[in-house]
Regions:
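A short Gly-Trp-Pro
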Residues: 1-136
Length: 136
């Protein structure tokens, strides 16, 4: 397994701050669904044990649609969605790579998550929210 580092992240106004343990070379997903396209969310899915909300829980509000499984959390002050609980991995946390401090990131490799083929795409990334996840 790749060695982990602690990345720090925040929303635009800084009221919501968090940490996530992830590799310095991040494998991210770009989803082509409507909400991800419109918000520019770049996905890093991790098990809950690797995510820590440091401050700002009181500034988070949720938006749900369609099946209601995904809990899109965004800062009610600046409107940025720094992380959420994804429909593809409802037992994980999905961090917006664009909200991470770039100082701890060496590279970001982006792969497509094809929402038009959601079932196959979801099956391919199911392991991401598991503890000790390694790419298969």
């Amino acid at each position: 397994m790749t060695a982990m580092v602690t990345h720090r992240g925040a929303c635009h106004c800084g009221r919501v701050r968090f940490e996530v343990d992830a590799p310095v070379r991040i494998d991210a997903l770009e989803c082509n669904c409507s909400i991800c396209r419109m918000t520019g969310f770049l996905h890093l899915i991790v098990p809950p044990a690797r995510f820590r909300l440091l401050q700002g829980a009181e500034f988070l509000t949720a938006y749900t649609f369609n099946t209601g499984v995904a809990k899109h959390r965004f800062c009610r002050v600046c409107g940025i969605k720094p992380f959420y609980v994804p429909r593809s991995n409802p037992d994980g946390i999905d961090v917006n790579v664009r909200c991470l401090d770039p100082a701890t990131i060496k590279s970001v490799k982006v792969e497509l998550f094809d929402d038009a083929n959601r079932e196959a795409a979801t099956a391919a990334i199911a392991y991401l929210s598991e503890d000790n996840s390694v790419k298969r």
